[in-house]
Amino acid sequence: MYHIELKKEALLPRERLVDLGADRLSNQELLAILLRTGIKEKPVLEISTQILENISSLADFGQLSLQELQSIKGIGQVKSVEIKAMLELAKRIHKAEYDRKEQILSSEQLARKMMLELGDKKQEHLVAIYMDTQNRIIEQRTIFIGTVRRSVAEPREILHYACKNMATSLIIIHNHPSGSPNPSESDLSFTKKIKRSCDHLGIVCLDHIIVGKNKYYSFREEADIL
C-alpha cells in the first residue's frame, strides 16, 4: 500500500510551492493543487491522500480509470477528466524528452521509450522503427494493433515501409499486455522470419524488443539469432 503521512504544514500547498518550490512538496500536496478544491465533508488534501492510498506505488497512478477516480468521494467527472488529462500530458512530456535524441544508441534506450508508449496497452501493438545509416530515426510506425482474429504481423507489411523510407536498418517492438516481456515460441519464430526477409533485401534488423510493464526483452541482448 502506498504509505502517506498527512503533515500539518501541508495545509496550504499553493503557498508552500511559492515559498519552497515544487520539488519540496509531497505527492499529495502536488495533487491537491491540481484538484484545487475539496467538498464540505472532505478537504482537498484528504481527497488527494485517498487517491494515492488506492495505489500500491506512484507508478500505478496512470492506471486509474475515470470510473475508479470517480468512485472516490469528492471526485466527479470534471476532476477525474482533469486528472487523466494531466497524466497524459506528463506522459507526452516524458516521451518528448526521449524523442529529442536523434540516434538510437542502444536497445535499452529504445526499450525505455517504448515502455512509456506501450507498457500499459491492453491490446498487442507492433511498432517498427526505421533508421538511416547513422541509426537516426526516419519514421516510427505502428504496423498493427492485435485483435482476437489476428495477432501476428507479416514481414511484407514491415518491409514495405522500410523500402518506402529507404531505411538501411529497422527495429521491431511489440508489447505483451500480460506485463511479462518473456518471448513466446511465436515471438521467436517471427523474429527469425523477419530477419530472413530483411537479409534478403539488404536491410539490417537490429533488434526485436518486447516490452511489458517496466520490463523489456531484447533479442539482440538475450538471444543469438540477430
Curated annotation (Swiss-Prot):
Gene Ontology MF: a single term: metal ion binding
In which residues is Zn(2+) bound? 174, 176, 187
Q: Where is this motif: JAMM motif?
A: 174-187
**GO BP term, example:** proteolysis
List the InterPro entries.
MPN, RadC_JAB, UPF0758, UPF0758_CS, UPF0758_N
Name any one Pfam family assigned in the record: UPF0758_N
Q: Which UniProt keywords apply?
A: Hydrolase, Metal-binding, Metalloprotease, Protease, Zinc
Q: Which domain of life is it from?
A: Bacteria
**Domain MPN residues, every copy:** 103-225
The family this protein is said to belong to: Belongs to the UPF0758 family.
User: Which protein, by its recorded name, is this?
Assistant: UPF0758 protein gbs1168
Which source organism?
Streptococcus agalactiae serotype III (strain NEM316)
